[in-house]
């Protein structure tokens, strides 16, 4: 890992932890809840279906599938490194969930939350789906020498996965931001 990448990874990790600390303040919690309620609002069955599908792109299984496609296509190094990044982001996210222990939105307010998927077992912060996808696309994108515009599009897709997590009722927006920062930290740390 280059020194610059190490410093960036530390900065993204620090920013992620700052988000967690901010949401423990009364004002941070209030703003997070307001943003969640707006994102979780009913927008009809088409939006439910789109976000229900988009969210799966952030699963570790989607990363495994993408890695398999890359490997079959002769891009084994990109596949292996991308999947390694996704796996490390997932493991880090699961570990942080146990440390932070934040309750999920649908448990905080069962009546006011639209829960559109099954209840996840782990706690809420950080959101692993955007972390996994952003770590994968950061590393695989660099391995594949994807241009800046393509990498921006892939990062935006990870952001959309994050939005889907709030829309579906399983994460506060700050969980998503924490997950995106974690995924970026892992991706940068593992990039050449």
Predicted features, each with a name:
Residues 75, 101-106, 170-174:
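Transmembrane helix-loop junctions in multipass membrane proteins, especially transporters and channels
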Residues 110-192:
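Membrane-embedded catalytic cores of phosphoryl/pyrophosphoryl-handling enzymes
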Residues 36, 71, 93-101, 141, ...:
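Membrane-water interface at transmembrane helix exits
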Residues 20-23, 86-97, 157-161, 165, ...:
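Alpha-helical transmembrane segments of multi-pass membrane proteins
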Residues 4-12, 77-85, 149-153, 174-178:
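Alpha-helical transmembrane segments of integral membrane proteins
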Residues 68-92:
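Interfacial segments of alpha-helical transmembrane regions
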């Amino acid at each position: 890992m280059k020194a610059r990448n190490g410093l960036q990874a530390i900065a993204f990790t620090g920013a992620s932890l700052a988000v967690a600390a901010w949401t423990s303040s009364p004002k941070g919690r209030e703003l997070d809840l307001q943003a969640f309620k707006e994102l979780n609002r009913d927008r009809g069955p088409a939006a439910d279906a789109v976000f229900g599908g988009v969210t799966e792109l952030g699963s570790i299984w989607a990363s495994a599938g993408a890695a398999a496609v890359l490997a079959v296509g002769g891009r084994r190094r990109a596949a292996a490194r991308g999947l390694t990044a996704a796996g490390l982001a997932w493991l880090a996210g699961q570990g942080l969930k146990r440390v932070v222990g934040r309750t999920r939105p649908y448990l905080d307010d069962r009546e006011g939350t639209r829960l559109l998927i099954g209840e996840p077992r782990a706690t809420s912060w950080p959101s692993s789906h955007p972390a996994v996808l952003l770590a994968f696309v950061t590393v695989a994108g660099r391995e594949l020498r994807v241009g800046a515009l393509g990498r921006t599009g892939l990062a935006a897709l990870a952001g959309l996965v994050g939005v889907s997590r709030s829309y579906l009722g399983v994460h506060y927006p700050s969980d998503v931001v924490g997950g995106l920062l974690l995924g970026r930290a892992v991706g940068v740390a593992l990039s050449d």
